[in-house]
Amino acid sequence: MSVQPAQEGDTASFIHAARREQLVRCAIELIAEVGPAKASTVRIAERAGVSRGVLTYHFRDRAELIEQVVRSVYDLGLEFLGPRMAAAASPREALLTFIGGSVELYAAHPTEMAALSNIYSDKDGVPRAGHHRHTREMAELAAGLRAGQEQGQFRAFDVDVMCATVRGALDAALAHIAGGGSVEPYASELQTLFDIATTAPRGD
């Protein structure tokens, strides 16, 4: 039986997607090991077992590949945390889920986290503060904190300061995990800390 044109197109698209995924994976691994400055397109292609021409066929330049690495790690985080966040019954539960789940994510996917951290920390890399995925994550965190305040679950505090504090604590958690530390009791202690820091005082 002959392969129909539509089937041929589907096969080609699958192969193309699989090759891009392979190249992104190899880029993640190499950047995690040596940092973005030393992760040249030649070295990434060598790791994937292909020529540099194959890499540049799938990605117009190194910047596009690096951006795809960043996007891939955020997508992984969304896949890991998204269902849990969606199931949270309140802003308080969502905050604690985000904090605890993030620490678990760091432990479950150390290579991806190392790659993203190396990209953000490189002087010529992608600045985290201006990246749209980071900005969106922080905006969602801020929205959850404001919702908690409006519903009376959280006390009055500066949301921007609290967001920055949560992010800083999670950055420290990532360093803890990367250094060989365990998820617990670190995650639960962070949850307790921010639960106390945000919870509205109870009336008499």
Residue ranges, per PLM feature:
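C-terminal peripheral helix-coil segments that are non-catalytic and often amphipathic
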Residues: 1-7, 89, 104, 108, ...
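Helix-turn-helix
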Residues: 22, 30-64, 68
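Amphipathic alpha-helical packing segments from all-alpha helical-bundle domains
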Residues: 75-78, 82-83, 108, 114-115, ...
